[in-house]
Amino acid sequence: MIVYTFTNTVSTSNTYVLCLEKEGIAWVIDPGDTSPIFKCLKENDSSLEGVLLTHSHYDHIYGTNDLFLAFPNAKLFVSQKASTGLFSPKHNLSRYSRNHQPYRVRKLDYICVSEDSRIHLNDDSILDVIETPGHHPGCLSFSIGEELF
């Protein structure tokens, strides 16, 4: 697995792309600016398997709609507490931004994960879910091997 990190233009949040080169698939954590994500997917000849959200503030989700337009069968993972922010500009805070339009995720189906959930990235790689409330009550962290997101 190769991990790519991109710093986004909105609030300098980070997006991570996990490329599983053998399978030709990738997973994205906290999609922001989509140009570097699409470039990374193309350069690694990978299709998007899923999107993982640490929480649902706007600066961590604003690339979601563009990704699901290109990869409609990809899965979306979020905590139950953060799921309200997918569809509420008030809860994802985009409503209060002077620079952006109110944002809503258009993908209606998502998978709620919580503490001790495990997400199979492929047959060999499993991502562990850790609840880390604080910045947002629905915050999640993801762990795989030595990597923590």
Ranges and model annotations:
Residues 33-123:
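Active-site HxH/HxHxD metal-binding segment of metal-dependent hydrolases
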Residues 1-46, 103-149:
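Catalytic core of the metallo-beta-lactamase
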